[in-house]
Amino acid sequence: VNIDISLADSQRRPVIDILNRLLADEVTLYVKTRNFHWNVEGADFSELHKFFEDQYELLDELMDQVAERARALDGYAAGSLGEFAAATRLKEAKGARVSAKEMLAQLLADHQAIIRNLRAEAAETGEKHGDAGTEDFLVGLMEEHEKMAWMLRAYLK
């Protein structure tokens, strides 16, 4: 069945590529957040353990939305660790132990990187590729990451 949504294949393909890069970033951030949930230590253990859980649960929802947006545009979502590792713009957290404060700082840096990428890619998606729907979707994701970044910054003050 052909897709007929007033977006040519030449408009949709680059947008699907943007979504798959974003999906790789979301997966990387999800895994890092989950890692920190498992490995946080210190006086704030209980609070941060729950905080990281809340964040990775939201990231799980966001990953699903990104993948489904790619499918809605008749594309395919990346689905392997190799694809995610090759496409992500974030750095993985290594197994080395880091302080709770460093965990928060790393997550904040990643959310801020995603926000910067989303801001640029939302504009590109709308202006260059004519996809107002995905532009709006990316702005919504940016707002979710801005809220998570704000919460991380609040812990670091």
Which residues does each PLM region occupy?
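Disorder-to-helix initiation segments
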Residues: 1-22, 96, 100, 104
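Long, contiguous binding/interaction regions
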Residues: 2, 45, 57, 77-85, ...
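Helix-loop segments that flank and shape redox-cofactor active sites
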Residues: 6-14, 29-54, 121-133
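Short amphipathic alpha-helical segments with heptad-repeat character
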Residues: 13-23, 27, 53-56, 60, ...
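A structural signal for well-ordered alpha-helices, especially hydrophobic packing surfaces
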Residues: 23, 30, 37, 56, ...
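Conserved alpha-helical segments that form or flank metal/cofactor-binding pockets of metalloenzymes
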Residues: 44-83
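Acidic/histidine-rich alpha-helical segments that form the ligand environment
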Residues: 68, 82-140
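Short conserved catalytic/interaction loops centered on acidic-Pro-aromatic/His motifs
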Residues: 75, 131-135, 154
